[in-house]
Structure formats: structure tokens, C-alpha cells
């Protein structure tokens, strides 16, 4: 049975892309905005976030807030986002945001920022 995904792509003969100013590569910056979209009893979830975290081996806390987990997400919204925004804005660099809808809904100041 043939594997259904194309993992070869163009192979050894990629198309001859012509980029502006003789550039040899194109880079796209993508920021994931998830802060406020994580599992939390505050959001009506049965337990705290356990999966999307830098806490190794984190487990959900049923019916309780996980203060360390919330702190990680809070930092992203309160400080991390603004640091990245300044860096990209100062350099006039375009950026793509992959945002969790509920996270964006809970962060109107970040969403309204040009």
C-alpha cells in the first residue's frame, strides 16, 4: 500500500524561485496566540490544562485551578506578546498570528493592536 502523504516534494529539482533583492530564502514568522484559550475551571472546563505546557509531566487538576500553569499562559499574554509585538513593529516585519478564538476574545487589547 502506498503511503498517502507526499514526503518527497520537488525532490532534487525544486522550482527556480526568484526572490526580491536577490534573496535566497523566504522566512515567515508565525506567532501562536493561545493565552486564555487553555483548559481552566474558570472557563467551565472540568480540569486545568495539562497538555500544552512547558511543565514536563504536567497533569490536569480536576475541579481546581493550576496556578503554575495559569502563570505560564498569563506571562505570554501580559509580557511575551508585547515583547514580540515591539520586535516585529520596530523592524516593520510582517507576522502571521495563529490564534485560538477564545484566547483572542479574552485579549481585546492585543487584538486591537496595529
Predicted regions and their residues:
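Catalytic alpha-helical scaffold of carbohydrate-active enzymes acting on polysaccharides/glycoconjugates
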Residues: 1-114
